[in-house]
């Protein structure tokens, strides 16, 4: 019996540059796991970005050591996770008035093929599910595809 080798098919989905916004919440882990699955064993690179939102009453270039320390810790966690899964990683911190606009701008600047965002389970007043401000903004305004992965939760969405 002769066994022939099957011709290797090209991957259906390939990404070279994935932007992963890091918020420092449990939702980051969901986005990091998905990014590791997509980039493991490839030459692709993950760009982790933490955005420090600066209120309008402060200067945009104002220093906030506490926020920078939090960002460093969150980015360090993400970098360690992806490095452990053999994914190339680059990290960055941005200061902006709104995280959504900073994420969209960074994706354009880095020529991201994909944005992978973690999403926390949140309920707004009245019991409905709420995606917040950042995720909907990025989904509406990004030129790159946006994938959201909601973090696991014990809470169920029961709406009347």
What spans do the regions from the language model cover?
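Structural beta-alpha unit
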Residues: 1-13, 83-115, 120, 153-160
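General small-molecule cofactor/ligand-binding pocket signal
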Residues: 47-49, 90-94, 147
């Amino acid at each position: 019996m002769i066994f022939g080798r099957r011709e290797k098919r090209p991957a259906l989905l390939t990404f070279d540059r994935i932007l992963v916004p890091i918020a420092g919440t449990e939702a980051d882990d969901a986005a990091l796991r998905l990014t590791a699955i997509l980039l493991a064993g490839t030459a692709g690179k993950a760009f982790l970005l933490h955005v420090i939102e600066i209120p309008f009453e402060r200067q945009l270039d104002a220093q906030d050591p506490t926020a920078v320390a939090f960002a460093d810790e969150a980015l360090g966690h993400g970098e360690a996770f992806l490095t452990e899964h053999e994914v190339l990683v680059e990290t960055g911190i941005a200061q902006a008035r709104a995280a959504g606009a900073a994420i969209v701008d960074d994706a354009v600047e880095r020529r991201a093929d994909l944005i992978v965002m973690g999403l926390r389970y949140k309920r707004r007043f009245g019991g409905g599910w709420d995606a917040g401000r950042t995720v909907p903004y990025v989904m509406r305004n990004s030129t790159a595809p946006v994938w959201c992965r909601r973090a696991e939760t014990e809470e169920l969405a029961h709406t009347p």
